[in-house]
Structures are given as structure tokens and as C-alpha cells.
Amino acid sequence: MTDIDYKLEAVPATRIAADDIDKTFRSSTIDLISGALGGKVLGFSDEWFAEAANLLTPTAPIRQPGKMVYTGAWYDGWETRRHNPAEFDWVVIRLGVASGTVEGVEIDTAFFNGNHAPAISVEGCFSQNDDEVLSWKGERGGWETILGVQECGPSQRFGWKLENPTKKQYTHVRLNMYPDGGIARFRLFGHAVPVFPDNTDAIFDLAAAQNGGVAISCSDQHFGTKDNLILPGRGKDMGDGWETARSRTKGHVDWTIIRLGAPGYIQNFMVDTAHFRGNYPQQVKLQAIEWKSEGEPGADSEGWTEVVEPIKCGPDQEHPVESLVKDKPFTHVKLIIVPDGGVKRLRVFAKRAV
């Protein structure tokens, strides 16, 4: 689209195929605006047909053919009126973390066909004042380009990886939709930039996504994804935890590896099986490693240290356990479940190793 008066910087970005979006971003970044993480829609130009807040829903869009509401057909996404007199509709979102740097963007137009967004762009800013950000509405204000104008199509996932991840941190983003239409989901992949306590003896959850933790790999995530382990709160049901398939092999275990937000001296853990009542693991083990090599550690890398005695699990409860190794810094934690099952959250309470 070349006939847009509101000019944006041409930020170099590579289009990612729909089937490659998850493997490109999900093992190294988090969705900075996920509703599960605390991302919040602060304002929008219009949401006549479907609410802008749906953009941040962590689960995939759904369709309910034939379902009608006051405004027309029901859609699981954000949809605005036709015939927008402005160049674009917009929605302003506050990140679910204190601030973050950005590596990529996903726009999903699932089930929007004939009413999908023809094109989008993404802008960001750093501000501690929500009201100031909202006052810019659809104007330039203090917005900076994260992703320039990109064309979209009907009912599919679109991904873009920035050639150079942003060095600047952002607290808010604005999604612009040209000129109007519908988008089901918006993901902003990147890294949380946490605000750590000044007191180096402070103990806090270094696995939490808000504190820079990332779930980098796992053996299986058939029913619930590994990323859920490091979300805030205790969730709402079995669907927002990590759950693996039933195993049929003797001696089987499942595992997931979490990179801590900073190297730390681990003091204790909390393993939470909230909502898992007939499918919790029989036992949980925890290992940690100080990884100094390139890339990320694998499940079989040398150097993993047992940091707790095996934990016998129960249904729908928190399991606090003290670390056996408090004087050694670690960068990653491996949660091992025996033989399989579901865990809602893993907390790793530690002092930063500075």
C-alpha cells in the first residue's frame, strides 16, 4: 500500500511462513502483550463488531458458524465498522511486562474472510503515563515504528521477524489496521526487561516471564504449553498449565527447561498442580545448571545438578520445597515430571548472582 499519508519507517523484516511462526519465536521469546501475562488494551478507534481485547487472548481463535449478536455475526477477534474515514483504525496496548524489546510480530486473521484487515503496522513507545499515550489517539505523538506497513490476507497467520531486534525498550504498542476490518489475534514476540530490586539479597521469582524467564524447550506439550508454567497467578482451569500426553513406556519421564531472567542463587521452589486433579505427576524432580556455552542447554547436557529431593505430588495444590544448593549460581532450571501429567506453575525463588 503506497497511498498512505501517515508515513512509517521501513524497518527491515522477514516474512515467516505460518507453519514456522511457533518454532521461530516460541522457544526463545515470549508474547509480551498476552492477556495471560497481563497485557491490556487501553484504547481503540472502534470495536463495533468485535472487541479489541480479543486480540490478546492466548489461545487460538475459534469459530461459531451461525452465531449472531446485536451487531451481526459473532467473531473471535477485533472488528471495526466499514467505511473508516481515517487512514487506519488503531488499538493501544500496554505490555504485560514492565518493558520489553521486540523480535517479531504475528497477525492472525483466522475466520475473517471478506472482512479481514488488508494491511497493518505496529508502533511502540516508552512511557510511564497511560493517559499521555492515549491522548495521541491515531496521531504521531511519541510513537516509533516497530514494523512498517505489511499486507495481510483472509483467514491465515502472518509472521514477521525483525532483521534487527529492537534495542529500545517499549511499554506500549499501537496496532494500526488499514483502513478497517478484522484481526483475530496479535502477538508481539520479544524479551521482558524486568526492573530488579536494588537490594541484591532480595528473593524473587527468577523464572517468571515478567522477570525475564523463558521456557526454552520441553519433551512434550500435548495438552498445555510449557510457556504457561511461568505465567502470573494460578490460572483459571486445566487449560492454562503444562500438560503432557499419557506415557505407555516403563521409566518414561517428561521435562521442560526454563532459562532464568538472570543468573541466581536459588533458595526455594514452588511446584503448583492447581486444577490438575486426576492427571498430576506422581513425582517431580528439579535440576539446575550454570550454562556458559553457546546456545542453550539440552536435557542431556553435562552439568545438570539435582537441587531438591524428589517431590511426591498431590492434586490441585502448591508444593513448596527448599533448594539443597543455595551457594552456587544457576542460569537454567529443568523440571522433570514422573512419568507424565500436568503442572500449572513453577516458581524459582532466588537471589540474583551479581
From Swiss-Prot:
Q: Which UniProt keywords apply?
A: Hydrolase, Purine metabolism
Q: What induces it?
A: Induced by uric acid. Repressed by nitrogen.
Write down the EC number: 3.5.3.4
What is the catalytic activity of this protein? Answer: allantoate + H2O = (S)-ureidoglycolate + urea
The molecular function terms in GO held by this entry are:
allantoicase activity
Q: Does the keyword Nucleotidyltransferase apply?
A: no
SUPFAM superfamilies, per the entry: Galactose-binding domain-like (SSF49785)
The pathway where this protein functions is: Nitrogen metabolism; (S)-allantoin degradation; (S)-ureidoglycolate from allantoate (aminidohydrolase route): step 1/1
Cite the Pfam families for this sequence: Allantoicase
Record-level GO BP terms: allantoin catabolic process; purine nucleobase metabolic process
Does the keyword field hold rRNA-binding? no
Q: What function is annotated for this protein?
A: Utilization of purines as secondary nitrogen sources, when primary sources are limiting.
Q: Which family does it belong to?
A: Belongs to the allantoicase family.
Q: What is this protein called?
A: Allantoicase
